[in-house]
Amino acid sequence: MARQKLSMDGNTAAAHVSYAFTEVAGIYPITPSSPMADYVDQWSASGKNILGKPALNIFGTPVKVMEMQSEAGAAGTVHGSLAAGAMTTTYTASQGLLLMIPNMYKIAGELLPCVFHVSARCVASHALNI
């Protein structure tokens, strides 16, 4: 079987790789990380990945995507699903990461392994709100 090669941007590549290792994705769309969450949500809903094959993670199941009302809600979802034992991830940008800090302290304190996919964008120092 020949390998299939695709040319893609960084958001697509990160989403493709993260999908394989994720059971639950807690998302809130925020530019410039929105495409990563959108791809994961699209693949989970349609049942097909970027290659047109069944969209299953390494556990043989589709990713459960939970879109929340804010970045803080997405971080809470990540914390809760990690505590329940699920392999969990989220996608955010630098400014949204600030809203996740309280939950990140809880996640770190409980030694729960997870991945936060953070796309590059500077944190606004003149206004620490979104």
Which residues fall in each region the model found?
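Thiamine diphosphate
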Residues: 1-130
